[in-house]
């Protein structure tokens, strides 16, 4: 057994020595630059490239829809204005108003249905099931919900990919994929803060009123453009707006250890972090109407 181990060890040492020797005497590799001659010398990678963006203003009326909302969905009407410094870089802003069109979810309808039944059965709020929600549910749950009133977002846009899309092997459209990011200023309506005292109650007629404020958050996302003709395109865009707010008007934090339990009042601690998502459809108009073409 010992003899066998010695033979195996000698073979391994020999293999390692051979490998080191090959590495030591390997000649260095050298690369040679290929110099093009003739008509291709100094030519660009693509000729007659349509510069859909360079030097043009982009005016894009748009409609946006919030996604994955708990209590109500918001339809935002607005648009985007960009100036394209190059075909791959632009700066501008997106803005929209969302206070006009809001649609409650089925969850909101169910909560209000149970809330109305309990209030009708016990108008004086003496039952235990009413006392537990006295500070969280007003007479009309829909009126205490948080909502996005408006958004203004200056942003920088980068366009790393572009190409063509073929439809039914007969229709060809220029397309591009872009990414954007920047700060967003968001106007919000939320249930106003209350101290839960006699002078500032969190229940009763005045305890469920709303107030407005402005939040500042990052915004980022990506989009696709499908160019219809020389001066217009159809755009689809996904946007993230992460910030903290009280969407349901509930008392969820502020008391107990680390303020993770209800405290029978409405404060800034009750605002929960939400990754708000928006889907936008736009019709893009480019000025001047004629695009440039590369050499």
Please tell me what each predicted stretch does.
Residues 154-157, 273-295:
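Outer-membrane beta-barrel "beta-signal"
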Residues 57, 88-91, 164, 230-234, ...:
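Repeated loop/turn-to-beta-strand initiation elements of outer-membrane beta-barrel proteins
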Residues 61-63, 79-83, 93, 154-158, ...:
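Residues on the lipid-exposed face of transmembrane beta-strands in outer-membrane beta-barrel proteins
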Residues 46, 65-67, 139-143, 166, ...:
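Extracellular loop and loop/strand-boundary signature of outer-membrane beta-barrel proteins
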Residues 89-194:
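Gram-negative (and chloroplast) outer-membrane scaffold detector with strong preference
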Residues 55, 73-77, 148-152, 175, ...:
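Residues that define the transmembrane beta-barrel architecture of outer-membrane proteins
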Residues 72-76, 104-109, 168-171, 190-205, ...:
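Outer-membrane beta-barrel translocator domains and adjoining extracellular loop/strand segments
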